[in-house]
C-alpha cells in the first residue's frame, strides 16, 4: 500500500470516544459516536512514515454505509487527512504524530446519515479497511435536528433506561416501572436493522423520516406478534405473557422471533418499544399517557355510548370509543418540512399499512399543531385533536331497540396527560402542551377554528346535541376513585328535583368490569330503586359495593365502571365513574445508599387482603447495575389476611443511581410490581 506504506494496526479508542459521546453504557469495545462531534483514532504504520512523504500527501479516509455505498446519495464520503478540518463536512485532521503513528480527529457532519459505517484508509488510490463504527443522532449538538438544550432532559429522554409508564384512571394514576433498555448493544443493532426495510438510505440523516419509518414498522411487527386472548390457555402461559418488564425482550421477539410474545391487552407496549428504539438511535423520546381518550373517531368530535335501562353498557359505536387511557410516543426534533413554530415534541401516530408505502402508515404530528387546532397540518392531526377534545353523548337503549338521548354529566377527554417527571419517579402533567385551560378564551377560539374547518370540509360540527328539557332532573354519583381488593365500599347517588312537580323515578345502579380500551369485560352487579321525589327536593340513596360482588369475576388488567341511570317522565339522566383497582401492595424496604461489590439486603413484604390464600408464589428481582441476571425465588403461600415477609440479597455491580424492581406472581395475581432506587457508591479506599 502506498509504495510500501501499510497499516500495522488501528485503535478506534472505543472506551474513550464512547465516554465523550455519551455512549459508554452501550459498549466499551465497539465504537458508537454521535454525529457532528469529533472522535479520535490512532493509526500505527508498519514503517517510519517520513520515508513515504510522497504517499502521505495522498492519504484520505473513506466512510461508507449501506449495502451499496455511493457518493451520489451521501452514503459514501471521501475526505483527506490534513492539519485542518471542516466541521460542517466529513473531515479528518492529524492531532499528534511520531515516526510510526498518527492520532487523527475525525468529524462527521451534523446532518450525516446514521447507521453502521466502515472506515477505510486510502493511500495513493489503494484502500485498507480500518474497522467499523456506528453513527447516531446527537441531541448535544446545536446543528443537529434533534438538539435538546436542557441537560437534565437529555439525560432523561435519551440516557435513562429506568422508565415509568402511567396507567389507571384520570383520578387514580398508577405508575408502572419499565426498563426501556435503549442502551443495550443489540437493541441499537435491531433498531438499525429495522431501518434496512426502507430503501431510502439517503434520508436516514433526517429524524422525521427515521421516526416515521420506525413507527410504521414497529406497528406492523406488533400486529404480527401480539397474541389474542383466546390463545392463552394455561396459567403459566398467562403469567409469561403478562410480563411488562421492558422493551428489549419484546423488540427481540418482534424482530428476530427470539424473545417474549406480547399479550394483546398491553397496548402501551408499542409506545414503550418505539420510545426505546428512538432513544437508542439518539432521538429524545418519551411515553405519554392520555386519560380518557377518544379513539377510532376518524377525526369526529362526538363519541356515542349506549347503555340499557339498568345502566349497563349495551353495544358500541362503530365510529369511536372512549378509552380509559391511551399511550403514545413523543419524540423531539426540528421540522424543516413545516414552519419553525412546529419544532419540538412530535407525536408518533402509526396506523394500519395500506398499500406498499411504509411512510403513509405513520404520521408525525407536532404537539403545537394539536394545541392550536391546526387539524389540517398533517393527516393524523385531526384524529389526535379529537382524541383529547371530543364530546361524549350517552344514549339509553330501550328493550325495543329505540334510542333516547340522556342528560349526562359531560365526560371530558384528554385529562391529566402525563409522562415521567425529569427530576423524580413521579408523573408530570403536560396537558397544557396539548390544550388551553378548560373554559378559557383561547380554548374557545381553537374550538371555533376547528368547527369552521369541519363545517367547510367535513360538513359536520363538533358540538353535541342539545339535551335541554322543561322537566329537568339532576343526578350525581359519588364513589371512590380507587378500590382496594378485599374491601367493601360505600357509594351514593344524589337526585335533585328542581321543579314544582312531584316525580316518580326509576333508578338503576350498575357495576361492570371494563378493559382500558373501553371494551366491556364483564357485567358484575346491578340494583334497582323506585323513588318518589317531592317538588323542589333532593334525595340521597346510599348502598354498598361488597367485594364478593366482583372479586372472583374481575378479569386481569380491568377497571370497574359504576353507572347510574334515572328514568322519569322526561329526559333520562345518566352518570358514571371509572374506578381503578388497587391490587395487593408489594412493599420494599432497603437502604437509600449502598457500596459497590458489597452485599445489599432488601426486605420484601406483601399482605393478602383476600379471603382465599395466595398460592404458587414466585418473587423475581432484577435491575441493571444491581443484578447480573434476573433471580426468582419460590416462597410460601400467603394465607388470608396474613402478611408474607422475605429477605433478598444481591451485590451491586455498578456505581450510580440504580433501580431494583421486584415482581410477584401467584395463582390470584400476575405481575404485582414495585421498585426502589438506590445510590451505589464506590468502595472506600483502605486507610
From Swiss-Prot:
Task: Provide any one GO MF term from the record.
Answer: protein-glutamine gamma-glutamyltransferase activity
**How is the protein disposed in the membrane?**
Peripheral membrane protein
Q: Name one Pfam family in it.
A: Transglut_N
> What Gene Ontology biological process does one annotation of this record name?
erythrocyte maturation
**What's the domain of life for this entry?**
Eukaryota
> Quick check: keyword Protease in the entry?
no
Q: Which InterPro entries match?
A: Ig-like_fold, Ig_E-set, Papain-like_cys_pep_sf, Transglutaminase, Transglutaminase-like, Transglutaminase-like_sf, Transglutaminase_animal, Transglutaminase_AS
Gene Ontology cellular-component terms listed: ankyrin-1 complex; cytoplasm; cytoskeleton; plasma membrane
Carrying Phosphoserine, the residues are 247
UniProt keyword annotations, A-Z: Cell membrane, Cell shape, Cytoplasm, Cytoskeleton, Erythrocyte maturation, Lipoprotein, Membrane, Myristate, Phosphoprotein
Which residues are covalently lipidated (N-myristoyl glycine)? 2
Where it sits in the cell: the answer is: Cell membrane; Cytoplasm, Cytoskeleton
Write out the function statement from the record: Component of the ankyrin-1 complex, a multiprotein complex involved in the stability and shape of the erythrocyte membrane.
- What more does the entry say? The substitution of an Ala for a Cys in the active site may be responsible for the lack of transglutaminase activity of band 4.2.
Kindly state the subunit structure of this protein.
Answer: Component of the ankyrin-1 complex in the erythrocyte, composed of ANK1, RHCE, RHAG, SLC4A1, EPB42, GYPA, GYPB and AQP1. Interacts with SLC4A1 (via the cytoplasmic domain); this interaction is mediated by the SLC4A1 Band 3-I dimer. Interacts with ANK1 (via ANK 1-13 repeats). Interacts with AQP1 (via the C-terminal).
Record-given protein name: Protein 4.2
Give the lineage: Eukaryota, Metazoa, Chordata, Craniata, Vertebrata
* Primary gene name: EPB42
